[in-house]
């Protein structure tokens, strides 16, 4: 199904060809309704390129434009913008087509790929904390959108389950472990012994050496140490799964660092044989003499003592994902501090001839209301599970005040959807590379750009259908029963400005979703949903639904139905659930 944007873009392309002009500029949704629904800067771009008057070029292009079946005659504005205003009939027909479409007008992408998305990646023997929230919810949202667009997505949780910290964990397990505490709260006890051992290591050379020996034994396959390591991994995985269950996050693979241990020698041998790496001062190193950015930043892939590092593991990971998982693209949703590391890794992979599209998707930090990195009062990282549970408690208080008559089960279910949705949306509505301030009051507000505001718009539509005593708008997973007034009407009537505006916004969902992957920006979708909710509330105030006469009543019910479906689908792509009541 063509979108308004694609229809106009095709006609613009034809007009440029007829005028003997090359393609240039872009056609975008207008940001101000005074300038129509869509606009293009093509004349300004061409004018600058060709040294011609952009307004005269715009008039020349408009003379070749044939858009009479889609929009009013295009208008030239300002220095040379070309503006398009859609016919009411165009909007009515497109809205009706989308109403009957399972995918809400969103076409699958033509260039389908197999994409491995590496996100989350917590460390074993440590609790997940607030620092993991951005990678986790951002990676999940990108995976949901990519899958909806037709890509084959493999979600990989590359957990940190190997490394020097296990020497300390194993020594602490053997010397400091409280078995009763382990039974009560396994991960908390593992964290305690790790912290205590780490403190001893910093001041006691004997403990430091003992921990090193435990690590050597683990790496050599000592049975006792492997058994302890396995228990630590199992306890940590259980804790991860509890958090992921709360957040509705799932993975297809959990290939941690240890999965690649047997592959690391092969990575080094391969790079040495290819002449990509060389031995330097006892270590195996890759130099980037031909890369100005990396020329003074060599990459060690095997240390002098024969040990491997993160670089070796990440190169083995790329090889596995490309050659065994057959990935066309690998997306790493990892914080900005790892930028240099991934530039080096990707440069080595390109030298090896890997053709997969490798992307490092960076993100900013979560700040407290003091604008510093979010911490507990004692200066520790805020545990993620505690943060999520606290969100649900805050939401529950609001529900108790607003709707005390609900049952306990209803209150708990709604609180979970609102609380977790608020946390996710606060993250995803911010541009990913910027820091954002974590504020309970702001993110749980029923006003402004928040998840509860969007959820409330959906709930309000559900209440309209309950009052109308007709089949309500669809929820994901329900049967495909639509009400007669919602889908079987022969025509929509959108005479009022508010309902016409809402219909235009609904139709633009199909234009917005593919844009999310251009720059990996879920905030584009979040901001669209916020504007859609604004449009619905304006429509709700201006256009009576149940009290209006036919054919407006059926038409407005259908528009409500479609708005609810878009809100629900859009929030689902962000990993956010909608309640039926609030």
Where do the protein language model's features map onto the residues?
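Non-catalytic interaction-recognition regions
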Residues: 1-92, 100, 104-471, 483-582
């Amino acid at each position: 199904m063509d979108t308004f944007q694609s229809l106009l873009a095709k006609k613009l392309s034809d007009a440029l060809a007829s005028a003997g002009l090359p393609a240039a500029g872009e056609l975008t949704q207008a940001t101000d309704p005074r300038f129509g629904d869509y606009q293009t800067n093509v004349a300004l771009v061409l004018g600058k390129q060709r040294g011609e008057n952009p307004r005269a070029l715009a008039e020349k292009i408009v003379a070749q434009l044939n858009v009479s079946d889609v929009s009013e005659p295009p208008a030239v504005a300002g220095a040379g913008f070309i503006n398009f205003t859609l016919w009411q009939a165009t909007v009515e027909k497109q809205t009706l087509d989308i109403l009957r479409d399972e995918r809400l007008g969103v076409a699958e992408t033509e260039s389908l790929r197999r994409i491995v998305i590496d996100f989350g990646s917590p460390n074993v023997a440590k609790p997940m904390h607030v620092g993991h929230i951005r990678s986790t919810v951002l990676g999940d949202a990108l995976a949901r959108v990519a899958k909806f667009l037709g890509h084959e997505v493999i979600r990989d949780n590359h957990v940190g389950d190997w490394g020097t910290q296990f020497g300390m964990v194993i020594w602490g397990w053997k010397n400091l472990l409280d078995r009763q505490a382990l039974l009560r709260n396994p991960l908390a006890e593992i964290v305690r012994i790790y912290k205590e051992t780490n403190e001893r290591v910093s001041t006691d050379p004997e403990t430091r050496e003992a921990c090193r020996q435990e690590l050597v034994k683990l790496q050599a396959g000592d049975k006792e140490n492997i058994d302890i390591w396995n228990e630590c991994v199992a306890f940590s995985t259980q804790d991860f799964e509890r958090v992921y269950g709360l957040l509705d996050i799932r993975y297809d693979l959990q290939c941690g660092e240890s999965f690649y241990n047997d592959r690391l020698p092969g990575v080094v041998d391969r790079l040495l044989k290819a002449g990509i790496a060389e031995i330097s001062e006892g270590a195996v190193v890759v130099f980037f003499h031909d890369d100005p950015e990396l020329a003074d930043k060599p990459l060690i892939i095997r240390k002098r003592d024969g040990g491997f590092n993160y670089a070796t593991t990440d190169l083995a990971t790329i090889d596995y994902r490309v050659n065994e998982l057959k990935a066309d693209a690998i997306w790493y949703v990892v914080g900005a501090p790892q930028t240099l590391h991934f530039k080096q890794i990707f440069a080595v992979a390109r030298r090896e001839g890997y053709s997969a599209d490798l992307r490092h998707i960076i993100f900013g930090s979560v700040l407290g209301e003091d604008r510093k990195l979010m911490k507990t009062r004692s200066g520790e990282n805020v545990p993620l599970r505690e943060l999520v549970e606290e969100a649900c408690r805050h939401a529950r208080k609001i529900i108790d005040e607003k709707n005390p008559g609900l049952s306990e089960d209803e209150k708990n279910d709604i609180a979970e959807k609102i609380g977790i949705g608020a946390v996710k949306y606060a993250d995803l509505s911010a541009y990913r590379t910027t820091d954002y301030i974590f504020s309970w009051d702001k993110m749980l507000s029923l006003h402004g750009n928040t998840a509860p505001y969007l959820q409330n718009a959906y709930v309000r539509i559900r209440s309209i259908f309950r009052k109308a005593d007709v089949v309500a708008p669809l929820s994901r997973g329900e049967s495909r029963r639509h009400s007669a007034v919602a889908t079987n009407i022969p025509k929509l009537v959108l005479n009022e400005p508010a309902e016409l505006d809402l219909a235009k916004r609904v139709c633009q969902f199909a234009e917005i979703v593919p844009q999310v992957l251009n720059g990996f920006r879920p905030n584009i979708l979040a901001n669209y949903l916020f504007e859609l909710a604004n449009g619905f509330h304006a429509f709700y105030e201006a256009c009576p639904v149940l009290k209006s006469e036919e054919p407006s009543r059926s038409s407005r019910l259908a528009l409500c139905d479609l708005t609810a479906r878009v809100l629900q689908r859009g929030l689902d792509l962000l990993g956010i659930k909608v309640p039926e009541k609030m």
